[in-house]
């Protein structure tokens, strides 16, 4: 979910995994679909869903996570940003991230639907430097 230019998706496909990679600006190719989570559907559940720096962009987070629960039979693997934890919070940073989900919102919605199996804070690159405690990795399995 949120495959960007598709490096990870291509790597997984080359390693022999069946991959469906979605992004509104996904590249051309058999494994890629230009769509959003909101518009995506598949009749078969996925063994895992990987989302890297994309969950905070989902417009209706609750509905999006409910859809992931329906689409998933294995773990949800996230590499995300807690943009609202940046100190100092510059006006430019706030404006750039306005309308995106912050960490508290994402975490509350995840906890309502998934059981955490792994979590860690990670540095996140901002303006050429690594900002500690701004990125996070999360693995969860559906509570249903």
Q: Where on the chain are the PLM-derived regions?
A:
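Short catalytic micro-motifs in class I SAM-dependent methyltransferases
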Residues: 53-54
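Conserved class I S-adenosyl-L-methionine
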Residues: 77-94
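Core SAM-dependent methyltransferase catalytic element
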Residues: 127-144
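Class I SAM-dependent methyltransferase SAM/SAH-binding core
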Residues: 5-39
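A conserved beta-strand element that flanks and buttresses the S-adenosyl-L-methionine
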Residues: 50
């Amino acid at each position: 979910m949120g495959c960007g230019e598709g490096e990870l998706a291509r790597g997984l496909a080359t390693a022999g995994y069946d991959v469906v990679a979605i992004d509104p600006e996904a590249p051309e190719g058999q494994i890629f679909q230009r769509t959003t989570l909101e518009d995506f559907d598949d009749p078969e559940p996925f063994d895992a869903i990987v989302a890297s720096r994309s969950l905070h962009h989902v417009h209706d987070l609750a509905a999006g996570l409910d859809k992931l629960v329906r689409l998933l039979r294995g773990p949800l693997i996230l590499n995300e940003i807690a943009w609202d934890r940046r100190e100092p919070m510059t006006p430019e940073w706030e404006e750039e991230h306005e309308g995106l989900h912050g960490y508290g919102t994402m975490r509350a919605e995840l906890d309502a639907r998934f059981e955490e199996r792994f979590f860690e804070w990670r540095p996140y690159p901002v303006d050429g430097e690594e900002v500690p405690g701004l990125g996070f990795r999360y693995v969860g399995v559906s509570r249903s």
